[in-house]
Amino acid sequence: MTWKYDVVVVGSGIAGPIVARNVAKAGFSVLLIDKKWAIGTPKQCAEAISIKVFDKYDIPYDKRFINREIYGAKLYSPSGYELEMRYKEVSGVILERKVFDKMLAYYAAKAGADVLARTEALDVIRKDGKIVGIKAKHEDEPVEIYADIIVAADGVESTIARKAGINTYAPPHEFDSGYEYEMLIEGFDPDLIHLWFGNEVAPRGYVWVFPKDEDRANVGIGINSDNPKTAKYYLDKWLEENNIPAKKLLEINVGLIPVGGFVKELAKDNVVVVGDAARQVNPMHGGGMAEAMEAGTIASKWIVKALEEENLSLLQNYTKEWWETDGKRLEKVLKVRRVTEKLTDEDLDLFIQILSGADAEKIASGDYAEVIKALLKHPKVLMSKRRLSLLKELL
């Protein structure tokens, strides 16, 4: 079989359908493919996202994929100090990713894109030294898909970006290992997400409880992937220490989480890479849905312009714009992550005691200069040359 489109998008997670929808809306022929039998499965996500993304990226606020509205967060230090951020208005939601991802593909289809599940991209097709399409397998049948532009939105292990010669390598230290139970659990405020920090609790990461119902939540952990012990070991240890029986497990999810190593070259000739495939993830908390939406929006803008003007060199503006905007922000967040890796449990106790909720949000988003300057004046920071040195790395 042979097919021809203006654009083929490989991967129907978050970034892929955003690109497919936006380009199809502009009147171009688009094919969105995903290797899974059912788009959205298996879940590899804690499912929390800011309320702001729905308006910003023109996504309907549909109760079919929203499990619970969230009003803030609660952070716990190694010694049990707490920092609560509670808002009067909804600040975020816990999604049902299996439904959300499928609905994003649905919106792309409604905009005019063709969407095919169980279609796996295997390689690129080259003609006279140029990439002109991809080789794929659709329901076990070989197919050649020719396209003017190819979008690699196929996740952390992106086949298409690698086959196209885009350097997506990142060392193991730039990944976290994630392990998560969806389980019955009680005793936590279901209107907040809950995060526990500590070098013995979750090395370089945190434990999370993200409520999906009054007594049901995603309970998971992310730790450095080069740790000799597994994420499951630390999660089960935390559950046992907190007397939470792991006997009502509805689902188990595992995954590799990029927390750095952003891909430098986001467009090469007629190939564009977005989302997890480009490591476009917040290095502090490992969340990448909003980042994928932003990257997909920027990429689709330049894809449309390149097609309209029949000038593929315009795709390079995607790389330029992303690095000048979200890339610049995420590089600042990465600096924070590098510093937090050096914090002791005593440091974590101190900062959770003296930071406000607004301060914590600014640090996680990369807008931290004023917060750091204020911390540098705190007596317990001034008394420690090591803490002073660490914080000054962020300025």
UniProtKB/Swiss-Prot annotation:
The keyword NADP does not apply. It is an enzyme of class 1 (oxidoreductase). Belongs to the geranylgeranyl reductase family. DGGGPL reductase subfamily. Keywords: FAD, Flavoprotein, Lipid biosynthesis, Lipid metabolism, Oxidoreductase, Phospholipid biosynthesis, Phospholipid metabolism. NCBIfam families: GG-red-SF. FAD binds at A15, D34, C45, A46, A48, R97, A121, D276, G288. It comes from Thermococcus kodakarensis (strain ATCC BAA-918 / JCM 12380 / KOD1) (Pyrococcus kodakaraensis (strain KOD1)). GO terms for biological process: glycerophospholipid biosynthetic process; membrane lipid biosynthetic process. The keyword ATP-binding does not apply. One of its GO terms (molecular function) is flavin adenine dinucleotide binding. This is Digeranylgeranylglycerophospholipid reductase.
